[in-house]
Amino acid sequence: MKNRLLLIALLTLAGCAPMIQTAPVPLTPLTNDAVVPAIRFETSADLRLDTGYTRTLARSSVWKPAGRLPQGTVYRPAGTVFTIEGRQVHEAYLVIQDKRLVGFYLPGEQSYSPLSMAVPITTGEIQ
């Protein structure tokens, strides 16, 4: 009986989603004289996270600049909440460098979560 319960527990743990990899990083706010326009996705972008979960960045979704990290410019969604998922669900902002999504800033944890492969994105500026 004990062995059976142990086996069930191990199988349950093996079925759990992996944790999202993060590293603490300070978000540098944009200065008043920094002109970073909001962006709008011109096409949808499907993302496959390292955790196995997928997310879609919807066509025409608007993202406003929230600050900078060494990894790129941080954008938060306008009028909605965007999340990424692993073992837990995390609110996430996009980190974009050279027209590529390189990872996510997790505001609740004040951490950066990189993508293993950057995703090319097509955006337009909003005035």
Predicted regions and their residues:
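C-terminal partner/receptor-binding element of secreted or periplasmic proteins
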Residues: 98-127
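Short, low-complexity, disordered segments immediately C-terminal to signal peptides
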Residues: 22-29
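Bacterial signal peptide processing site
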Residues: 17-20
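Sec-dependent signal peptide recognition
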Residues: 2-8
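Mature extracytoplasmic domains of secretory-pathway proteins
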Residues: 33-97
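C-terminal motif of bacterial Sec signal peptides marking the signal peptidase cleavage site
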Residues: 12-15
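Intrinsically disordered regions, especially transient/low-confidence alpha-helical propensity segments
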Residues: 1-2, 60
